[in-house]
Amino acid sequence: VQTCALPIFTEGDTAEIYVYNELDEETSLHWHGLFLPNKEDGVPYLTQMPIKPHTTHLYRFPIIQHGTHWYHSHSGLQEQIGMYGSFIINKRADDPTFRKGIDDLPAIPVILSEWTDYKPGNVHRMLHNASDWFAIKKNTTQSYFEAIKLGYFKTKVTNEWKRMLAMDVSDVYYDKFLINGHNESQLSQFKGGDKVRLRVSNGGASSYFWLTYAGGKITV
């Protein structure tokens, strides 16, 4: 899996982003959390026509904010197979809120996500069918024995009749969890004692991530 290109801008810039669609299907890109003209928002058949296969599309909009954002395909289930990436907007150096020693630290974009070897269309179908398969893969199914033991046999039968199985918060089993499109990341350009600024986005389809740092507290 490879995430898409990494746009880095400074507040006050004008973004010009050319999308070359080399797919055999339509696509589009949505700029998550960005303030921009409606026609550049990237929702096919609503704010723009989809980008046809083997054509080029230009997104052009002013950058009027700063922060850590991300972008993703808004067509079909393309986001679930890796069409997403970080979108970083730096503060201007003359911004009165610019913090020396923080905003000028080396920045590392980190986009977290997940990966399943199942085709996204199959995942979508299995969720609609309320299958127990993903729960079985994660060893989180509730057996009839457990339901009887805990006094919830009637509830379990009623829920199954309603096709409301005992799913957890994230109903999909993932084969890998990714950082910038890989299952691990090495930052060999830094040494012990260096300070860096992580620009973190959650590009996952259904996963929550809890971040810890072996060296102590993370300043947010």
Regions found by a protein language model. Give the residues of each.
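Extracellular/periplasmic metallocenter environments
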Residues: 23-26, 34-36, 45-97, 105
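Short, small-residue-biased leader/transition segments that mark boundaries at the very start
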Residues: 2-6
